[in-house]
């Protein structure tokens, strides 16, 4: 029997966690209180759903209004090419 996992929250992180767990063979249930998952992603990039940014990590951190340091690990460990490969590997076309 496959491992069973519940992911609470259908935002960007929750969706990526659910997809990654499912790719390992886990039976995943994603719970979201809103009618659609990824709601905030829909409004980024003027409705085009920005999934990454090609700015240097230092620029991303400097442009974060409050305490950008908390993003350091995520920004430095997930370069734009990795994010793009993740989505294209799922069959999501990117512009």
Task: Put a short name on every predicted segment.
Residues 3-30:
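N-terminal Rossmann-like FAD-binding beta1-loop-alpha1 element of flavoenzymes
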Residues 2-3, 88:
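A general secondary-structure boundary signal
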């Amino acid at each position: 029997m496959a491992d069973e996992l519940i992911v609470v929250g259908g935002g960007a992180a929750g969706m990526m966690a659910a997809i990654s767990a499912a790719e390992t063979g886990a039976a995943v249930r994603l719970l979201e209180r809103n009618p659609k998952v990824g709601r905030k992603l829909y409004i980024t990039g003027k409705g085009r759903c920005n999934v990454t940014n090609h700015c240097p990590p230092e620029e991303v951190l400097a442009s974060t209004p409050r305490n950008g340091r908390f993003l350091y690990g995520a920004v430095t460990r997930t370069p734009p090419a990795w994010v793009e490969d993740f989505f294209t590997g799922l069959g999501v076309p990117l512009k």
